Amino acid sequence: MSDEMIIRHCSPTLAGLKTGNLFNCPCSDKKELILAVRSLNKRLAPKGIRVIPIQVCEQRVLIYLYRPDKLENDLAVEEAGEILRACGYSTGDGDKCVVRLSRRLQESGDFPHEIGLFLGYPPEDVRGFIENHAVGYKFVGCWKVYGDEKSAKKQFARYKKCTDVYCSQWANGKSIERLTVAV
């Protein structure tokens, strides 16, 4: 799990624009993974970032890089809470919800549809995805949009611009610690 991979997949979260990102990386050695995650958390926690292996498979791991404070705020939205309760979550507490999400990923192997709430997607789009079985959307970008298409398109453009700038800055020698914004 290289810093370059994290920057490519998680720039909007590092910049404070997004609640969280998910990315897959190869994992042949679990001990090495644990050391890498600990090191990354030590480096990024002072900026408000947490990194966890949310799903571990035989030769790969799904990493969740997120901002716990932003997640708490996102999950406190009434519509988000309704979606979580309907999916069997008993609380809106961010840490407990992340543990529950990880269990659901391990148990089913599929992505639980509520996962969008953990990535900063608008609850109306997450609900639309669940209720419409991933069809009937208005637009597709980083997620399928069922609500405010104009706002979503602007957000997608911000995420792309952020990723482009961060990748360029990384290529020019800026460290992940310097690129990560304290929020």
Language model features with spans:
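Short linear loop/turn motifs
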Residues: E58-Q59, V98-L101, I130-H133, V140-G147
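Hydrophobic/aromatic-rich, well-ordered segments within soluble, folded domains that form packed cores
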Residues: F111-K138
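Short helix/loop capping segments that flank catalytic or ligand/cofactor-binding pockets
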Residues: L33, N73-D74, R127
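A structured, charge-rich N-terminal accessory region that forms the first stable segment of a protein
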Residues: M1-C57
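Short, surface-exposed beta-edge/turn micro-motifs
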Residues: K18-G20, Q59-V61, P112-E114
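A glycine-rich, hydrophobic loop/mini-helix early in the fold
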Residues: V37-D93
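Internal catalytic-core helix/loop-beta-alpha segment
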Residues: A86-H113
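Long, compositionally biased
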Residues: C142-V183
